[in-house]
A protein has these predicted regions:
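C-terminal transmembrane helix and the adjacent membrane-cytosol boundary/short C-terminal tail
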Residues: 94, 160, 164, 202, ...
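Transmembrane alpha-helices
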Residues: 80, 158-159, 181-219
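Amphipathic cytosolic juxtamembrane alpha-helices at the membrane-cytosol interface
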Residues: 14, 99-103, 171-199
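Interhelical loop and adjacent transmembrane-helix boundary motif
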Residues: 56-63, 215-264
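Periplasmic/extracellular loop-to-transmembrane helix junction in inner-membrane transport proteins
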Residues: 2-20, 37-79, 100, 245-254
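Transmembrane-helix boundary motif in ABC transporter permease subunits
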Residues: 79-111, 124, 274-283
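Generic hydrophobic transmembrane alpha-helix motif, especially the helices
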Residues: 112-150
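Transmembrane alpha-helical segments of polytopic membrane transport and secretion proteins
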Residues: 1-25, 274-287
Length: 287
C-alpha cells in the first residue's frame, strides 16, 4: 500500500515537473518568436533601397545607413580575423600543450572574469588605451580591438570545451601511427571540434553586431563612408550606434526599427554561413 502511494506521488511529481519544464520552454520560445516578429513587423516596411544605399545628409535632411552598414562589416571582419586565431590558438595551447595546471586554471579564471565585465567598462578602457595611449584616436580599428578583448574569453572557452569532447583514444591512435603532436592537433583534434569553433564564431559575431556601448567610446558617432581597410583608421558609427542615435537623439523610431530588422537579418545570414562553412570543413577533414 505504501509502495503504491509512493509510486503515485512520484508520478504526480514527475508530471508536474515535466509540465513546468514544458511551460518554461514554450514561454522562452514564444518570447523569442514574439521579439523577432515584432521587430520585423515594425522595421521591414521601412527597409528600402534608398535607406540602405545612401549616405545621410544634414543639409538636405536625407536619411541613409550605407556608411553604418559598411562600418559594421569592417569592424566585424577585423574583429573576427584577430579574435578567432587568438582564441583558438590559446585554447589549443591550454588544452593540448600546457603542462602547468595552475597556469591553465589562472587563465581560465581570468577569462571567466573578463566575460562578466560590463561592455561600457571595455569601452572606457579601450578609449584610454587604444585611442589615447596608443594614439589611434577615435577609429574603427580602436573599436575592433576593443571588441577583440571582449570576445576573446567567449572564443577561448567554447573552443576549450569543444576540444575536451574529442576522445583521448583518437589522439592515442594517431600517435600510435607515428603522427607528431602538431599533426595530431591539426588533422584529428581540430576537425573533431569544428562545431565548437563555429559556435564561438557565431557567438562572437552576434555580440559584435549587437555591441554599442563599447563602440560609443572608441569608434564614435560619425556617419561617414570610409574606404575598406584604409578606413579603419577613421571614426565611424556602426548599425547599433546608428540605431541608438536615431532613436534617442533624433526620435526617428521608424529608422531605428528598420536598422534592428537589418541587424536581425544579418545575424541570421551569419549563422547560416557559419554553419555551412563548418559542415564543409568537416566533410573535407573526413575525406
Amino acid at each position: 500500500m505504501l509502495t503504491n502511494k509512493l509510486s503515485a506521488s512520484r508520478r504526480v511529481y514527475t508530471a508536474v515537473m515535466r509540465a513546468l519544464l514544458l511551460l518554461a520552454a514554450v514561454l522562452t520560445a514564444a518570447l523569442v518568436v514574439f521579439m523577432i516578429v515584432y521587430v520585423l513587423y515594425k522595421g521591414l516596411p521601412y527597409v528600402t533601397w534608398h535607406l540602405i544605399s545612401t549616405k545621410p545628409s544634414y543639409i538636405t535632411g536625407a536619411i541613409g545607413i550605407l556608411p553604418d552598414i559598411c562600418n559594421t562589416v569592417q569592424i566585424l571582419l577585423a574583429s573576427l580575423l584577430i579574435v578567432l586565431p587568438l582564441g583558438v590558438g590559446a585554447a589549443v595551447y591550454l588544452t593540448e600543450y600546457a603542462q602547468s595546471k595552475k597556469l591553465v586554471a589562472a587563465i581560465e579564471y581570468a577569462a571567466e572574469t573578463l566575460s562578466g565585465i560590463p561592455s561600457i567598462i571595455y569601452g572606457l578602457v579601450g578609449m584610454l588605451f587604444f585611442c589615447e595611449f596608443l594614439g589611434m584616436q577615435t577609429s574603427l580599428l580602436a573599436g575592433a580591438l576593443t571588441l577583440v578583448i571582449m570576445n576573446l574569453p567567449t572564443v577561448l572557452r567554447t573552443t576549450q570545451e569543444s576540444l575536451r569532447t574529442v576522445p583521448q583514444s583518437y589522439r592515442e591512435g594517431a600517435f600510435g601511427l607515428g603522427a607528431g603532436k602538431w599533426r595530431v592537433v591539426r588533422t584529428v583534434v581540430l576537425p573533431g571540434c569544428i562545431d565548437g569553433i563555429v559556435t564561438g564564431c557565431i557567438l562572437s559575431a552576434g555580440r559584435i553586431l549587437g555591441e554599442s556601448a563599447a563602440l560609443l567610446f572608441t569608434a564614435g558617432f560619425a556617419h561617414t563612408l570610409n574606404k575598406f581597410v584604409i578606413g579603419l583608421a577613421s571614426p565611424g558609427a556602426t548599425l547599433t550606434v546608428a540605431l541608438y542615435a536615431y532613436a534617442k537623439e533624433e526620435g526617428e523610431f521608424d529608422v531605428a526599427f528598420a536598422i534592428a530588422a537589418i541587424l536581425m537579418i544579418l545575424t541570421l545570414l551569419i549563422n547560416l554561413a557559419a554553419g555551412i562553412v563548418g559542415k564543409q570543413i568537416q566533410k573535407r577533414s573526413q575525406q
